[in-house]
Structures are given as C-alpha cells and as structure tokens.
Amino acid sequence: MTRTLKPLILNTSALTLTLILIYTGISAHDKLTWLMEVTPVIIVVQLLLATARRYPLTPLLYTLIFLHAIILMVGGQYTYAKVPVGFEVQEWLGLSRNPYDKLGHFFQGLVPALVAREILVRGMYVRGRKMVAFLVCCVALAISAMYELIEWWAALAMGQGADDFLGTQGDQWDTQSDMFCALLGALTTVIFLARFHCRQLRRFGLITG
C-alpha cells in the first residue's frame, strides 16, 4: 500500500516524541501520574510504526495524533491541573480553574473520531455520511466514557493519591464537562475536517470515488 508519509518524516516524528517522552519523564511532577498519562502514547506510537507500511494513515491523522501525544505528555509532566500555559489561559480568560485538561479531552474526542472515520470510510463498513458521522461521535464518546471509568477505578485503587491523575480541581461536574469537550472534538472532526479528510483519502488512493 502507498505510504502517505516518507519514512524519514515518520521516524523523525517518532524520535521527537521519544525525546519529549524522556524529558517529561525526567522532570515529571509525579512519576506515577506521568506513567499513567503517557502509557497510551507509548502504545500508540509503537502501533503506528508497526502498521505504517501495511496500513498507512492520512497525514492529517498522523499530525493530530502527534499533537495529541504532546498534549498528553505535557499533561503528564506537570499534571493537568498544574500545566503553566493553562494558568496563563486561566488568568487571561478569568476562569476559576486551569483549563488545560479540557484541551486534552477535546483532542480525546477529535483524534479517536478521526481514527474511527478513517477506518469506517476506508473499509466501506457504513454507507451514508450521516451514519458515519453519528457512529464516529458514538465511538469518541464511548472512548471518553471508558477513560472516565479508568479514572474512577484509579480513584478507588489509589485513594487520595489519585488526585493528580483525576485533575478535577474541585469541580463536581468534571466528568460531564470532560465528555462534553470530547463531544466537541468529535463534532469538529465530522463538521470541519471531514471534507479535507476525504480529499486526503482520495489523494493517496486509500478510497476510490
């Protein structure tokens, strides 16, 4: 199958993420929280490198995964409630809490939605744009809900030590707002990125028509 990215670009991106991973791990505020946050990055990067030849993704998807990985690693480094740039945004917008975790949850909807869309469209598993859009949003919300369950399990297992991982910042509606941000990310995919995504799929011969 035709590669969508040159091996040099893909390998350089993986190396960049590895270096960021090492740096954030060394300087992490809490090593256990960092490990829990970056584990998905480690798994996904290995998976993408292993499948780059037989199942290459669109450059758009690779780019968004790259950005999402950085967001996760920075969140793991400081813990989401203490990311410095989040405090700057909080002050600038006059918010009551650090909003960096909401950026993470937005991408948690955006990226899985695009992954789901790419798989569904390329595999021709579903006919009809509206049904594809609906299923893409369902997948993103399901992943978001699973992540919230993982946070709950972590809270039960770790007790007070899970506060940095949960990052609720005293917000009783944190779970609901997290999932809403994920939904916004998924809607961004189906409303604003779908056409460009389809053009890339056609350009690289990943779909026909």
UniProtKB/Swiss-Prot annotation:
The chain crosses the membrane at residues 8-28, 32-52, 56-76, 132-152, 178-198. Keywords: Cell inner membrane, Cell membrane, Membrane, Transmembrane, Transmembrane helix. InterPro entries: UCP020606. It is a multi-pass membrane protein. It holds the Pfam family DUF2238. Residues 1-7, 53-55, 153-177 are periplasmic. It is found in: Cell inner membrane. Residues 29-31, 77-131, 199-209 are cytoplasmic. GO terms for cellular component: plasma membrane. This is Inner membrane protein YjdF.
